[in-house]
Amino acid sequence: MREKILFTEEECKWLLTHAKEYSPSTVSYDIEKKSNLTHIHNSKDRLSEEYGLGKPEGKLASFLLEKLKPIGFINLKGTFLNYLRYYKGGFFAKHIDGPERHKTCIIQLSSQDNYSGGDLIVNNEVISKKIGNTVIFSSNTYHELTKVKKGIRECLVIWTKKGNLKERKVLI
């Protein structure tokens, strides 16, 4: 796991503006054939919202690729973006991402002054809440978001498939 502040506050605001143009997506899990399980991710009661931004294209793709090159992203082919907004009470229980995913990248978009709680924990390590902080880790690593106690926490999540992230000994 590696983390580094890669985005300025202004760039995070730009990403938020772009993300908010999309409609919330439906979160579905194949656990017991149920959808929107509130003990995993409470999007059903709208304490969190997930926006599937799909494959990055145009200005967004160019911008993200340029900013993420220092941590090994050589292209965005085969990647998928999600914008997540967590309100008071919102959380995402400890989990690993789907088997088709190779790397997970999470960009902190909201200021740590805008919310309390909502700690991102990756492999039992609490990740910095500084705006623009970017963390990348193997998608088969356990991670979670603790319950937001007040305010709103926003982030952008990018997943890659194998072959889309240039592996280096020192990514950050």
Which residues does each predicted region cover?
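Non-heme Fe(II)/2-oxoglutarate
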Residues: M1-I74
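Catalytic core of non-heme Fe(II) oxygenases with the double-stranded beta-helix
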Residues: G58-I172
